[in-house]
Amino acid sequence: MKLNLFILGLLTLAAHAYALVARDKLLLPHEDPFFQPPDGWQDKEVGTILRSRKVTIKTLVKDNLKEAWQLLYRTTYTSDDEPTTTVTTVMVPHNAQNDSLVLFADFEDSSADRCAPSYSWRAGSLDDPSASTRVAIAMLYLQEGYIVTMPDKEGNRGAFGSGHVEGRQSLDGIRATLAFDKLGLSKDTRVAGHGYSGGGIQIGWAASLKKTYAPELNVVGWSAGGVPSNLTALIEKINGSPFAGFVVAGLTGVSSTYPEVKEYMEKVFTKQGLEDMEFPKKFCSTGIVLRFLFKDFFAKDFSKVGDRYLYEPVVRNILEKLTMGTNPDYTPDAPMLLMQAKNDEVAPYEAVKKTYDSWCQEGAQVHLVTLNNPLSSHASTTVTSSLPGFLWVRDRLQGKLAESGCHENKNFDVGINTNALGEDFKGILGILQGFLGDKIGPNDEYLIDWFKKHK
């Protein structure tokens, strides 16, 4: 079964149409009483469940689910003395296994709470052209029988790109899910995680922080693709490009997390620049990309100091802390799969290779797959990496040991075999392959054309 882009478009339009109705019925997280913690929550241990509720998921996964839950839990921001709370959405398939748990890192790529999975997956309001792809990847794990937990990893500040926040809140989301008595999980449950692009930030930092922040978790492997492992390198690469909107999205998320960065940016950004920084707090990734197509965020209409704000010590030091592989203490202690297109025009390949080299020097167990096909791009690799990522996670959860040490190999695929997992998975893999169709090419020409038409 191969769905073409026309069918994918219908699925996306259907999601939009449904969202117009659903949004009227659902409260946004900042309006929803469920998200307000009870008295005394600050004194609880991280990962403690403060409240739970059963919910309905309105994306395409709904037919694969026995039930879904949301858990409000205690967590932190960048340090232990910054207590906060957030929510994870737990999806339970009909054939659920209680010896395995998958952390699915959805890529929000925005600071707006309407884009958090706790809201968008309930409202059916995933708003970008890859929405069906993201849902289909989650469906792979549900179809296999894995319980999937999907944290709102940005917290109340909308900390997009702030890896220490995303990592801590993801690990605490795992703790909360394992402790939830309706699932039959335990501290011995095997845990693995998968994420792509913005979800790769979440997975990369959960993997990095696990050894020091949550050493008790039985994590057996992590899978990540299209990883923005170095935000400075990403900003330098995409500024002025069709994907320039992710520059302001990242700056907004980091400044919301680190007060010293926010204070500095308020001094050096223009009035227009500060107005631009408000946009990612209200809109999701597609709206952000459309608003800032080809925008130069080093220009004088945005910054009084040109590109120098990126290299000012107060900003540079934080961005260095948010670069994977710079601190030996934050080296993954569970096997990790990295998948990156050599021609990735959003998340620079060279930065991921440097992270890989740094982790390996510290004794990590990492497999780097380089997608070398000239047609491989950031968007196409979402699909190309989905099947090998799933197979790798499944092997780890089934107790198969990953190859020791570090190793690399090249992959020239630019699609997936929809028959690879048998009849039960054929429709899901068809949705994924359908996103590629026959129009994906170098530098994500299909997506760029889509964004231009919808500007």
Swiss-Prot record:
Q: Where is the active site?
A: 197 (nucleophile), 344, 378
Q: Does the keyword Nucleus apply?
A: no
Signal peptide as annotated in the record: 1-19
Q: Where in the cell is it found?
A: Secreted; Secreted, Cell wall
Q: Which GO terms describe its biological process?
A: lipid catabolic process
Q: Which GO terms describe its molecular function?
A: triacylglycerol lipase activity
Query: What is a single Pfam family found in this protein's UniProt entry?
Result: LIP
Gene3D superfamilies (UniProt xref): 1.10.260.130, alpha/beta hydrolase
Q: Which reaction does it catalyse?
A: a triacylglycerol + H2O = a diacylglycerol + a fatty acid + H(+); a monoacylglycerol + H2O = glycerol + a fatty acid + H(+); a diacylglycerol + H2O = a monoacylglycerol + a fatty acid + H(+)
Q: Which GO terms describe its cellular component?
A: extracellular region
Q: Which UniProt keywords apply?
A: Cell wall, Disulfide bond, Glycoprotein, Hydrolase, Lipid degradation, Lipid metabolism, Secreted, Signal, Virulence
Function of the protein? Secreted lipase involved in Dandruff and seborrheic dermatitis (D/SD) probably via lipase-mediated breakdown of sebaceous lipids and release of irritating free fatty acids. Has triacylglycerol lipase activity and is able to hydrolyze triolein. Mostly converts monoolein to di- and triolein, while free fatty acids are only produced in low amounts.
**Which protein is depicted?**
Secreted triacylglycerol lipase LIP4
* Native source species: Malassezia globosa (strain ATCC MYA-4612 / CBS 7966)
